Amino acid sequence: MKTNPLFLVPLCLIILSCTNTSEKDLIEQIDPTEPITYSEHIKPVFDSNCINCHSSPAINGAGVSLTTYNNVKNSIENTNLIDRINWQPGQGGFMPLGGTRLPQNLIDLIIQWQSEGFVE
């Protein structure tokens, strides 16, 4: 059975068009006029990236739980949480431990939430 090689060209084009070019393509963009809130924007970031260790109670040597609004707010205000998620993998204290660095737009979102006064 012979296969028409022209069939492969459209197939390759379809496959290539399904790729993304940046991490921002993978994350829903937020309306810049909308206030950043813990419940809608910040909690999902921490739930997806932090509570494997920073649960209640914290495990794997994690020093604090990051499961509630007050836990996260206090960690940002009283520890170097934002610095630790900003560091590059391999730096001592980098978070998430053993994971990959959060996309910059998520780090920026957390910083913006802080600058807007930690809206719940």
Model-found features: residue ranges?
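Sec-dependent bacterial lipoprotein signal peptides
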Residues: 1-17
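Aromatic- and Gly/Pro-enriched helix-to-coil junctions and flexible linker segments
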Residues: 18-120
